[in-house]
Amino acid sequence: MNENNDDINNLNTPCVLVLDSVVRNNCIKMNERAASLGVNVRPHMKTHKTIEIGKYQFEENKNLNKSRGIIVSTLSEGKFFSKEFKDILYATPIAPNKVKDAYQLHLSIDRLNVMFDNIEHLKSMVDYAIKNPNEFQKKWSVFLKIDCGYHRAGADPKLQSTTDLVELIVNGEYNQYFQFQGIYSHSGHSYKCQTPTDIKNLAIEEARVTGDYGKKLKSLGYKVDTVSIGSTPVCSHLPHNLLSEYGVNEIHPGNYTFYDQMQYELGNCKLEDIGVHVLATIVSIYPERNELLVDAGSLALSSDPGCTHLRDLKVINNFGIVYNDTNLRIVAPSQEVSKIQSTNQSPIDFSKYKIGSKIRIIPNHSCLTAAMFSDYHVINNDNQIINSFKPNKHW
């Protein structure tokens, strides 16, 4: 749907605004950063969940990823993006109840790459192949997920049992069912870093752990096409010798399309790089207690508190900040409304903030915030609505 020349002040609130030129520029900069190091970007779709922004992530031929391979967080996303992208990685170790749908998607595109970090994942995929011999037309395409220190998912690369999984599918009894693509790690613990220097050191550590394991597998005779690392913080502070020293040839950031207050606080972006805002309406003002009330609560902003480890919570705890007046912060979100206070308790200029007027909020965590909405209003540099994007929803 095209909404040319519409003013954002006419929109019902709360709603999401996507800053088109900012998002495009974020995509280009990440691709250029990776290309300068000689590595691919396999972008994650989970933040924006839209075909349009997925295309932005491959614009201007800056991305060395010629297969236009992407990552999704759900099979619903996989089906949604399969209309445009044919090399998809499903980023969660596969549960048995997802196997059938995953294989049907695999058959419909060039390949659906599936994660495993446990022999039970392999068994469930083999079991499906054995029970459905007429449907099993091509091997499963798989990545081994390894743990580089986040401790959420992934096999321990130091254990022999991890390498035994690779042997099982490459040379062992499961060989006829699998095509091994490579290894994948995710440094989600980068969001707990204190400084950009800490993130740079963690990026080196993830590259070392993942790269060394890739080299080990190759030394044992295994073909490892892809060694993939990343999170948006790490991919914003990549070591210059990523490929030459560590053998890492792919990164997989996701949040960088939008960024958010967390990324800003961590030093991964500037405020002007944040490509998504929540538009809200001031529903009441309280000069006597120096507060505003807006119609964007937890169901519009999420309740993610962000980088609390970087804040003096007695002074600056917040669930988002006000665009163009970052001294104002969202506090105490309830379901449909939130209070706004000033960071240092300085007097709010109520002449600027009237009941019924609109404000734009920079969210703590854009992935969760964007997921709250069924459409995005795309705006240009003049704050005019130029398009509407509809994201994939649910599972």
Curated annotation (Swiss-Prot):
Disulfide bond residue pairs? none
Q: What is its EC number?
A: 4.3.1.18
One of the GO biological process terms? cellular detoxification
Q: Which residues carry this modification: N6-(pyridoxal phosphate)lysine?
A: 46
**Which Gene3D superfamilies does the entry mention?**
Alanine racemase, D-serine dehydratase-like domain
* Catalytic activity of the protein: D-serine = pyruvate + NH4(+)
The UniProt keyword set, sorted, is: Detoxification, Lyase, Metal-binding, Pyridoxal phosphate, Zinc
The record lists pyridoxal 5'-phosphate as bound by 184, 191, 232, 254-255
User: One GO MF term, please?
Assistant: metal ion binding
Q: Where does Zn(2+) bind?
A: 365, 367
Q: One Pfam match, by short name?
A: D-ser_dehydrat
What is this protein called in UniProt? Answer: D-serine dehydratase
Provenance organism: Dictyostelium discoideum
Q: Which gene encodes it?
A: dsd
